[in-house]
């Protein structure tokens, strides 16, 4: 499957007739983040790619299309009626946490297969990188486009630093240091926001015993996903930690560690997105 999705997209396995635009507009239970003219189809394009190319569980996407006359995008997808892992985490047993983390680790390994021949850091639609660190008010090719090499990605972060009118001497310092830290990494299709609030959990009643239960997971929030250097997933997962529970202590069991890289990327993120 090509990484880009041809739009409009309509799935062939829709369980019920698709709602009309009028029904969507009048629906009462649509999440605020999926309302209005700001709806971005790239998150669902990412999910379609993951659904097709990996074993990572994501909500089923049934339709992606636009109405240019009113300037709106429409997404029809599976509703996941489950609790977030963040809400349930404190109540889980050690064995249940181990089971969930083992599944997440296996999904991380699966994602690496999708990138073995991929050579460009980019978003799924080959357009602007959507991680906040690359945000600019208007598209800037030097900062948030696709990048052929890891060195070019490093330069993009330095360009973002100077773009925001920060001291050029420190930008020069980053130019000296980053090539020694962010180098030699392979590319991997990256979720980009690996937090337990973005993982939905449901117990499977068919596999429950007196002392154990099987927990099925579905991963949400693929908006910022794309092909990034292999350190990106771990570093962003650590950067997002609030340390209000022990979730951060389990990350090393699900993602490859990049200890040196996370220290530098956290500094950059604080400066470039604050």
List each model region and its residues.
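Active-site Asp-x-Gly
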Residues: 188-189, 202-268
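A positional/structural detector of protein chain ends, strongest at the extreme C-terminus
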Residues: 271-274
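Short, low-complexity Ser/Thr-rich regulatory SLiMs
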Residues: 65-68, 201-205
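Acidic active-site catalytic centers that drive phospho-/nucleotidyl reactions
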Residues: 43, 191-193, 198, 221
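An alpha-helical support segment within catalytic cores of ATP-dependent transferases
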Residues: 97, 113-192, 202-214
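ATP-binding pocket architecture of kinase catalytic cores
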Residues: 2-141
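Short, glycine/acidic-enriched loop or turn micro-motifs at the edges of active sites
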Residues: 66, 81, 196, 224-225
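The start of beta-strands in P-loop NTPase/AAA+ ATPase cores
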Residues: 55, 73, 186-188, 216
